[in-house]
Design a protein with these regions (language model features):
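Phosphate-handling catalytic cores of nucleic-acid transaction enzymes
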Residues: 1-400
């Protein structure tokens, strides 16, 4: 019975009780979950995810995203991947998880990011004396440069010969001491400006990480100019150069940088961001670049159990994260340059082509993917990125 029919019934029979139909739920109705393809993960990752899930009891997709995001962070500066001679891309991945409060995503992130955070702290402490020495040398260099500028300026007013000072300055400028970079792997709740400046001037491989992504995507910089922030994230995913121009300060260029994205937000916030005029447009291509998950809530069934004495599978996972990060220790201001190029073996390429064509066939009118053409168009590239990361994380050599 419609609302109009009910109103008419009440008017004609004011003393008769009305039976209303089933109310529409206010919460979103999700399609039945597809089993998460945990068996497709590399054995090291699969065992760590499954073993931890038995204790933590978070939804499996949520734990897997944490493990895969840290795998992307640890491997993204080690290689690029080629689909053919012209289609070459980074191996970095973006993850976006829609989930409510209390799902224990932070706990899973803390467990699977432990090795990378420990590596970051260890390298920073080890390099601290070298960095302090370089900073002192740079201060001396700056004073010498300022002194030569003063000599040239004074000579300009007095008419003295300044050729020698100019030659000395020209030589000195090319001798600027380089300050070793200190790794900063995780940016949490960072603004667009802070992220861009660090990537341009700091450690060239990092991640944007938050279990309350609404703070980032709903920040002042995002609300003020969401298109610019999304353009930056899209460029970094593509591995392209991004130039930032400033009115009052010197601009900078982000080149040869790598970024992993791992964001979780409330489903309602994601809905608002994608629907409001000032939010993230589907046409921007940002969401399509993300691997998205909306796992069913497991709250109410997570009864306490004692943690295992040790998780050997998690130890093996952490060892691989550390080993991969060790290979990136020599990164410099130049960024992720001259990276090895991973190619698919003939068998892998054939399987990838079958997948590519199957997805493409579903994009036609009335096709399977007609409502999500933006996501489907990036699926094949995300697939080969995953394959490349599995290859790197397992320490394999040769083609994928």
């Amino acid at each position: 019975m419609t609302i109009e029919q009910n109103e008419l019934e009440i008017k004609n029979n004011p003393h008769q009780s009305i039976t209303w139909g089933q109310p529409i739920p206010l919460s979103p109705i999700l399609a039945p979950d597809c089993p998460y393809p945990v068996e497709a993960l590399p054995s090291i990752v699969r065992k760590a995810v499954v073993d931890y899930q038995q204790y933590g009891q978070q939804p499996l997709p949520l734990i897997a995203c944490s493990a895969l995001a840290n795998m992307s962070l640890s491997c993204q500066s080690l290689a690029n991947v080629a689909r053919d001679n012209y289609l070459i891309s980074p191996v970095s991945l973006y993850f976006l998880i829609a989930s409510g409060s209390g799902t224990r995503k932070t706990a899973a992130d803390n467990v699977f990011s432990k090795a990378a955070r420990h590596w970051e702290t260890l390298i920073r402490k080890r390099r601290e004396p070298e960095v302090l020495s370089a900073l002192t040398q740079h201060q001396v260099w700056q004073m010498e440069k300022d002194s030569l500028f003063s000599q040239i300026k004074r000579a300009t007013y007095t008419g003295e010969d300044s050729d020698y000072a100019k030659e000395m300055l020209d030589e000195l400028i090319h001798q600027e001491p380089e300050i070793p970079l200190q790794p900063t792997l995780y940016f949490e709740d960072a603004t667009q400006e802070a992220l861009a400046i660090h990537l341009a001037q700091g450690w060239p491989s990092a991640s944007l990480w938050s279990d309350e992504a609404g703070i980032i995507l709903g920040s002042h910089s995002m609300q003020g100019n969401p298109t610019r922030f999304v353009a930056l994230l899209n460029r970094l995913w593509d591995g392209k150069t991004f130039t930032a121009h400033r009115k009052t300060t010197q601009g900078f260029t982000i080149e040869n940088r790598r970024l992993t994205l791992n964001l979780m937000m409330q489903p309602l916030i994601l809905q608002q961001l994608t629907k409001q005029a000032s939010g993230i447009s589907r046409q921007s291509g940002f969401l399509a670049r993300c691997l998205m998950a909306y796992p069913a809530n497991s709250m109410g069934n997570r009864f306490y159990q004692e943690p295992p004495a040790s998780l050997h599978s998690l130890t093996h996972y952490e060892q691989r994260v550390t080993a991969c990060l060790n290979q990136s220790e020599q990164l410099s201001h130049q960024g992720c340059i001259q990276l090895p190029l991973l190619k698919m073996s003939m068998a892998a390429k054939q399987q990838w082509i079958l997948f590519f064509n199957a997805v493409e066939a579903g994009l036609k009118p009335q096709g399977q993917w007609v409502d999500v053409v933006d996501f489907a168009s990036k699926a094949a590239e995300n697939t080969v990125r995953l394959a490349a990361l599995f290859h790197l994380f397992e320490g394999r050599h040769g083609d994928i």
